[in-house]
Amino acid sequence: MGIASVVVVGGGVIGCAVAYYVAKRGLKVTLIDQPKRGRATSASAGGLWPLGESVGLGCGVIYYKAVAGMGTLPDGVQGPGQLPRTFLDFAIRSNAMFPQLSEELCEISGIDIELERTSLLFLMYDAGDEAFAKPLWERCPCGKDLTEWLSPEELAKAEPAVTRAVRGALRFNGDDQLNPYRLADAFRAAARNLGATILTHTEVTGIRVESGQVKGVETAAASIPCDLVINAAGAWASEIGRMAGIEIPVRPVRGQILGTETLPKILTACLSTTDCYVAQKGHGEIIIGSTTEEVGFDVGVKPAAMKTLSAGAIRAMPFLQNVHLKRVWSGLRPGSPDELPILGPVAGLDGYLNACGHFRTGILNS
């Protein structure tokens, strides 16, 4: 096997995106797709929510509600609204790239990522929700340019299927959605069409380092010499890091998700509440998520989570009590101590880059 200038480890959306951008630069790249169950792409509804997530009112609000009952947040976890302004700027810029990226990927790969300009609505059921959201909204760096405070009447007009038992909603107009599976497939196919080598069902067994320089990647099938390895292994990034002699603080965080039967279009925006998020995809399925669980690499689905998420979705959209669930599944998000991605080189190790720890924002930041 010839020399691969760049080897990307990880076949989720981040790994496929990295391989695409490297191939687009004309470099020789090999993408190693390890056979791992439950990678983060499968735990995503495909939300592009730079504003909602940055201020703590995206799907992360479910987690914050849970830990609030404990009195304090776990060590190393920031509270709502405390993600750095630099991350918000980064996320907004990333989101703004998607319309052009969608066209580009469709042209190169032939795959439509089903980008929809939807907005995100945070529903406020009671005074507690309102008190929680208002200061975050008031401190939002983008101010009133990309956000709106909707009255119950305005919400009912915008989304007739949403419950009337609300005090209002906060709308983030710059937050959208796409199909996460099609995004990963499009990045992968586009990378291949630009010359990337894709190794599927290939287990990485080691990273060869000599005198502080990465020299190659070992797999069960072959040794692949390279000048640079990029660790995009998602929840398994720590394992890959240790093969290179470094420690990366990435851990698996399980998210369980529900999907309904196909329905006519009844929801335009994506919904976020303190119970769940709800998003209707282009093909009619409604996605309901998501738990945030520290259970290691367990990708099982639990009846208790299904019940809790279902109740939250019905509270947001009473119509759903008469709708059948079609599927349930889970995925492992790559959590980091501060919920921010871990990117770039590592001191003392040449030829190695991290592209991991994206937690809930891997789709957005791909």
Regions found by a protein language model. Give the residues of each.
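N-terminal Rossmann-like FAD-binding beta1-loop-alpha1 element of flavoenzymes
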Residues: A4-T30
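Active-site substrate-recognition segment that forms the wall
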Residues: A17-K24, Q34, G46-E53, G60-P80, ...
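Short loop/edge segments at beta-strand edges and connector loops
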Residues: D33, S151-P152, T200-T202, R327
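Dinucleotide-binding Rossmann-like beta1-alpha1 core, especially the glycine-rich loop
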Residues: G47-E154, G312-I314
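Helical element adjacent to the flavin cofactor pocket in flavoenzyme catalytic cores
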Residues: A169-L228, W236
